[in-house]
Amino acid sequence: MRPGRREALILGAVGVGAAAAGALFGAFALQSRTGAAELLAHAFVDLAGKPRRLVQWKGKVMVCNFWATWCAPCREEIPLLIAAQQQYDAKIVQIVGIGIDHADKIVEFSSQLKITYPLLVADASAVDTMKQLGNRSGGLPFTVVLDRGGAVASTKLGALKPGELDLILAPLLR
């Protein structure tokens, strides 16, 4: 094969790869924007049974944590989230727990751990919302951080580790 032809084939392959990566990233970005809009508009209920939407906290950095009382890693990370809500001014950062569980179990669990941030109750449709936000497996815990404008800044499947949330929030609070 002539050197010119070989270089052209390599450049063509690189171009196709770059186009595919761009399309994949674009699809993920669109999926994240759609998922964020749906998350903000989704009608949850609070522990008193009143309808609540996350859009009420738009303008703040939001840490939306999907969890369940039966999920061991979820239970382990809750003290970290309680500490984070105490550390950060609620005027700037709002942590919201979205329980995929029965309200009575969430109420009981919340009183045991003295959870200080708002807890909302989700139905099974929350799994679809999580999938739109990139959690294809629907696993828990799943944390979505939204910037002040309501766009997805970060997602994390699995329990947050100490200090990890600080690293995620730091650039959003500048």
Model-flagged regions — what are they?
Residues M1-A41, V45:
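N-terminal targeting signals for export/organelle localization
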Residues A41-V61:
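A short beta-strand-turn-helix
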Residues H42, F66-W67, F109, Y117:
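Conserved hydrophobic/aromatic "anchor" residues
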Residues V61-M62, P141:
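Alpha/beta-hydrolase fold active-site loops
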Residues N65-W70, I100:
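Aromatic-flanked redox-active Cys/Sec active sites in thiol-based oxidoreductases
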Residues T69-E76, F142:
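C-type cytochrome heme c attachment motif
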Residues R75-K114, A124-M130:
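Structural microenvironment flanking redox-active thiols in thiol-disulfide oxidoreductases
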Residues Q112-I115, D123-A170:
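Thiol/disulfide oxidoreductase modules built on the thioredoxin-like
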